[in-house]
Amino acid sequence: MRHQKSGRKFNRTSAHREAMFRNMAASLFKHELIKTTLPKAKELRRVAEPLITIGKVDGVANRRLAFARLRDKEAVGKLFVELGPRYATRPGGYLRILKAGFRAGDNAPMAYVELVDRPVVAEEVAE
């Protein structure tokens, strides 16, 4: 029986799943907006939000903890220098998931995942 087993499998091995969400979280922190399938977006929330909470308190131990989970120096640097201070007063809810219709090839539900309170660039508004 599958009682108390939280999280989606996505038809991948645990190592593949872990690497996928590690890469997605790093991309989210770098670009602050990514497009993915809706189930992956909902599962990414469980990975990215605790990392932002860790990024709110800068220190060697927290940086090492974040690097152990992300394995991306650039993303960890931005997490502590830019994102942590930005969300210092926010007690959670750092991500916004916006539904974006269905993918043309397989009709999978798509979604945008973005960081709340991200600076909007003028050229993005023009789109």
Swiss-Prot record:
Fetch the InterPro entries from UniProt.
Ribosomal_bL17, Ribosomal_bL17_CS, Ribosomal_bL17_sf
Query: Keyword Glycoprotein on this protein?
Result: no
UniProt-listed Gene3D superfamilies: Ribosomal protein L17
GO MF annotations for this entry? structural constituent of ribosome
**Domain of life assignment:** Bacteria
Cysteine pairs bridged by disulfides in the record: none
Question: Which Gene Ontology BP annotations are present?
Answer: translation
Q: Which GO terms describe its cellular component?
A: cytosolic large ribosomal subunit
Q: Which UniProt keywords apply?
A: Ribonucleoprotein, Ribosomal protein
Q: Which PANTHER family match?
A: LARGE RIBOSOMAL SUBUNIT PROTEIN BL17M (PTHR14413:SF16), RIBOSOMAL PROTEIN L17 (PTHR14413)
> What is annotated about its quaternary structure and interactions?
Part of the 50S ribosomal subunit. Contacts protein L32.
Tell me its family: Belongs to the bacterial ribosomal protein bL17 family.
Q: What is this protein called?
A: Large ribosomal subunit protein bL17
